[in-house]
Design a protein with these regions (language model features):
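Topogenic membrane-insertion module of multi-pass membrane proteins
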Residues: 1-51
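Membrane-water interface at transmembrane helix exits
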Residues: 33, 37, 41, 67, ...
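Alpha-helical transmembrane segments of multi-pass integral membrane proteins
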Residues: 21, 51-52, 59, 98-102
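Aspartate-rich (DDxxD/NDxxD/DxxxD) Mg2+/diphosphate-binding motifs
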Residues: 63-106, 146
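Membrane-embedded alpha-helical segments that form the functional core of polytopic membrane enzymes
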Residues: 30-31, 41-67, 125-136
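Short hydrophobic "helix-edge" motifs at membrane interfaces and signal-peptide entry regions
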Residues: 10-11, 54, 60-62, 84-85, ...
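Intramembrane alpha-helical segments
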Residues: 90-151
Length: 151
């Protein structure tokens, strides 16, 4: 079966890089946390769950973008690689485009995390900053977690 022809820089390429199936890793913890919050005496605040969901989804998407671009730069993604197409390795998007998109997603994650910091204080600041750093450290930096059995 032949793949349909797609125009250069199509939304389909960005959707492929986004890897929607991985978003369950961001959604499930927020849904579980929201369910736990719903039975607490303080009650559940939908807007907190909404900001948490947006922030975690953008962190996951940024991780996917960085992984795609950095694995290509390091030579980890080759034509022999099994699994879904990696847009950078396939030449559908440049590593620079995908890295910029990852950075933009981190900015969005930060913006959506600010209201959580206002409510949750210093613990949320620490969790947020570590999450933002680990997004890149998964496949970037001098000791990428993905190459050490940690990802």
């Amino acid at each position: 079966m032949n793949e349909p022809v797609v125009k250069q820089h199509s939304m389909k390429f960005w959707l492929m890089a986004l890897r929607p199936k991985t978003l369950t890793a961001a959604v499930v913890p927020v849904v579980v946390g929201s369910a736990v919050a719903a039975v607490q005496p303080e009650g559940w605040h939908p807007w907190i769950s909404g900001f948490a969901l947006l922030s975690t989804c953008f962190i996951q998407i940024a991780t996917n973008f960085f992984n795609d671009a950095l694995d290509f730069k390091k030579g980890a993604d080759t034509a022999e690689r099994l699994g879904p197409t990696r847009v950078t390795q396939a030449g559908l998007l440049t590593s620079r485009q995908v890295m910029w998109a990852g950075g933009f997603c981190l900015l969005l994650a930060f913006i959506f995390g600010v209201p959580l910091v206002v409510v949750g204080g210093l613990p949320i600041v620490v969790i947020g900053l570590v999450s933002l750093a680990m997004t890149y450290a998964y496949t970037g930096g001098p000791y990428p977690m993905a190459y050490r059995g940690l990802g």
